[in-house]
A protein has these predicted regions:
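Catalytic core segments in nucleotide and nucleic-acid processing enzymes
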Residues: 112-113, 118-145
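Alpha-solenoid helical repeat scaffolds
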Residues: 45-48, 68-81, 85-97, 112
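Residue-level signature for tetratricopeptide repeat
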Residues: 4, 43-46, 85-89, 119, ...
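Hydrophobic/aromatic interaction determinants used to assemble and anchor large protein complexes
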Residues: 1-44, 63-64, 79
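Solenoid-like repeat scaffolds
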Residues: 19-30, 61-74, 101-112, 137-145
Length: 145
């Protein structure tokens, strides 16, 4: 349904179908379909339609609720960071804080501390707790992973 130049109507229909038939696909297929929907939202957001940020967060929230993000029992670091960034841009501070607390232990052990501290620093910065943000950022090692 989502082609390179897909329409918002196609997107809405896809989301409607996914909600109506949640058990039709295996987890891996469902993850791929949601990734296409996410990418569509991101393209629309990048084209200047900021209303789609809330659509994207809804997609993320559904996948979180269904545990679709977990790969081999771990939450991918990039998805974790993207979800935090989007939630903060939408000023959904309480939800972001709950998300981080609930899922930070699901990050892979080799990335757990770094990714969690980076998200926490973002959260503190967004909530204007600048001293806390700086304190937490001191514990972040930046890599290009």
């Amino acid at each position: 349904t989502l082609q390179a130049e897909g329409s918002t109507d196609d997107y809405a229909r896809l989301v409607e179908l996914l909600a109506s038939y949640p058990n039709v696909f295996e987890s891996e297929e469902l993850r791929s379909i949601y990734r296409y929907a996410q990418n569509f939202c991101i393209r629309i957001i990048n084209a200047g339609v900021s209303d789609f940020k809330s659509h994207l967060l809804s997609l993320y929230q559904y996948q979180i609720d269904q545990r679709l993000f977990l790969v081999d029992g771990h939450f991918p670091a990039n998805d974790f960071k993207n979800i935090i960034t989007l939630g903060l841009r939408l000023e959904n501070f309480e939800w972001v804080e709950q998300f981080m607390e609930q899922f930070h232990d699901s990050l892979s052990p080799d990335q757990h501390e770094n990714v969690y501290n980076y998200g926490l620093a973002q959260y503190y910065f967004a909530t204007k707790a600048y001293a806390r943000a700086i304190r937490v950022l001191r514990n972040v090692r930046f890599t290009d992973r």
